[in-house]
């Protein structure tokens, strides 16, 4: 597919502390965070004017699902708009706490693990056609996804029985299957639950749940952009060498524990290869493929960053990407802090730095401190992100949903929406079914809006 629908869902970690002590349970914090949402949406599961979905997931994790985007820059912008929306809820909730005489700070973390060892996810969605075998898609993708953390992991200090280690990925320790229909109990790499949120005869939604939540915008661009290119190669019938792994679940942990990318992992055919070699194989095929096909500026940026990141890992010169790739930015931050204060990697103060990198409150989070200092590269502009909080992408179905919600709210009409349905809850119960996610103009929706 030359034009694809993308979407990102991020679950956020939440806590409330007072002088370092836990003040409210996650359930209570979530209630404060969502009080404003519930007051206008009558639910903790709502769609917003920008076409996104905001809801409270299992285990009191706020989750933000971006609207459908058909280009990577829009996706990065809307992913960041989700952070800003949640930051707004956080500021509101803190005001309410103060009004009720409760002292404490609320923290929202865009990360994937908490101190108790629980994991929550960043789920990537890619629209693919029904043609071709889904199992072949998964077979080719799994070695790519297992090793992809080398180019876009969020980084993590992991406590192990042998001491603390710096890992590439937060999510790797929590993945237990290759392909499965579960998302929480067994946590596969690819989730196979068949919910296309589109015409099921034409489309399928590839649901990847192995990735980390990224703070750095270029890391998000590379995570989704590289995966899109691999999908395009599979769809075009490019012959890719069989890189199947003997045990993907063991391999994903081995890769995560080795930021040099050199550790040998066993292939299904009995040979061995490193994560670096596997990624270089995918990259070289991608470069050949796009040389023949031609490419746009954003795809060029993805290829350039992919190549530079692998070169940085291969040569050990991390300065090549220390403004763009999360695990490298965070590693540099932690190493500088350790050197300044003469601390071991296992120090609780280092764990604090690790966590503070993911704090979405811009006046407090360490990633945003680096952004203010101009120490990280950007993909989006702040104005774009601000606008995306209330404006949907203009080239996908999200535009129809966003316009419908905006008009219904302005006219104070009762309505129900999901990814495909737009419904006015009046006597006639008029409903429009929007099965084509690429369609941003629809006379039926315009009529429904005009009738309000």
From Swiss-Prot:
Disulfide bonds: none annotated. InterPro entries: Pup_ligase (IPR022279), Pup_ligase/deamidase (IPR004347). Keywords: ATP-binding, Ligase, Magnesium, Metal-binding, Nucleotide-binding, Ubl conjugation pathway. Belongs to the Pup ligase/Pup deamidase family. Pup-conjugating enzyme subfamily. PANTHER family: PUP DEAMIDASE/DEPUPYLASE, PUP--PROTEIN LIGASE. Catalyzes the covalent attachment of the prokaryotic ubiquitin-like protein modifier Pup to the proteasomal substrate proteins, thereby targeting them for proteasomal degradation. This tagging system is termed pupylation. The ligation reaction involves the side-chain carboxylate of the C-terminal glutamate of Pup and the side-chain amino group of a substrate lysine. The reaction mechanism probably proceeds via the activation of Pup by phosphorylation of its C-terminal glutamate, which is then subject to nucleophilic attack by the substrate lysine, resulting in an isopeptide bond and the release of phosphate as a good leaving group. This is Pup--protein ligase. It comes from Acidothermus cellulolyticus (strain ATCC 43068 / DSM 8971 / 11B). The gene is pafA.
């Amino acid at each position: 597919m030359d034009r694809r629908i993308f979407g990102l869902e991020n679950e956020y970690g939440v806590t409330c502390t007072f002088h370092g002590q836990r003040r409210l349970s996650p359930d209570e914090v979530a209630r404060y965070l969502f009080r404003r949402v519930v007051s206008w949406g009558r639910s903790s599961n709502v769609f917003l004017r920008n076409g996104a979905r905001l809801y409270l997931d299992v285990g009191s994790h706020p989750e933000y699902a971006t609207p459908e985007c058909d280009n990577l820059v829009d996706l990065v912008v809307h992913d960041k708009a989700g952070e800003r929306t949640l930051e707004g809820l956080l500021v509101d909730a803190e005001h309410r706490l103060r009004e009720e005489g409760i002292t404490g700070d609320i923290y929202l973390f865009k990360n994937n693990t908490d101190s108790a060892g629980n994991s929550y996810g960043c789920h990537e969605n890619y629209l693919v056609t029904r043609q071709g075998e889904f199992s072949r898609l998964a077979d080719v993708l799994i070695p790519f996804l297992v090793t992809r953390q080398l180019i876009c992991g969020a980084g993590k200090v992991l406590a192990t029985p042998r001491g603390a280690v710096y890992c590439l990925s937060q999510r790797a320790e929590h993945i237990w299957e290759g392909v499965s229909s579960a998302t929480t109990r067994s946590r596969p790499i690819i989730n196979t639950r068949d919910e296309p949120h589109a015409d099921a005869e034409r489309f399928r939604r590839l649901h990847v749940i192995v990735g980390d939540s990224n703070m750095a915008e270029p890391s998000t661009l590379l995570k989704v952009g590289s995966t899109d290119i691999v999908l395009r190669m599979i769809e075009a019938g490019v012959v890719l060498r069989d890189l199947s792994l003997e045990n993907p679940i063991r391999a994903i942990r081995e890769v995560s524990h080795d930021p040099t990318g050199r550790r040998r992992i066993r292939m299904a055919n009995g040979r061995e290869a490193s994560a670096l070699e596997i990624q270089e194989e995918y990259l070289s095929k991608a470069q050949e493929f796009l040389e023949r096909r031609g490419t746009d500026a954003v795809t060029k940026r993805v290829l350039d960053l992919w190549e530079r990141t692998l070169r940085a890992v291969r040569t050990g010169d991390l300065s090549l990407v220390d403004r763009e790739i999360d695990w490298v930015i965070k590693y540099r931050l932690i190493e500088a802090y350790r050197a300044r204060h003469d601390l071991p990697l296992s120090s609780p103060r280092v764990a604090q730095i690790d966590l503070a990198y993911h704090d979405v409150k811009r006046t407090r989070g360490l990633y945003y401190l680096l952004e203010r200092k101009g120490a990280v590269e950007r993909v989006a502009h702040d104005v774009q992100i601000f606008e995306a909080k209330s404006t949907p992408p203009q080239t996908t179905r999200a535009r129809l949903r966003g316009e419908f919600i905006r008009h219904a709210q302005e006219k104070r009409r009762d309505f129900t929406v999901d990814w495909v349905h737009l419904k006015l809850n009046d006597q006639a119960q008029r409903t429009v079914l929007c099965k084509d996610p690429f369609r941003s103009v629809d006379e039926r929706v315009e009529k429904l809006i005009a009738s309000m």
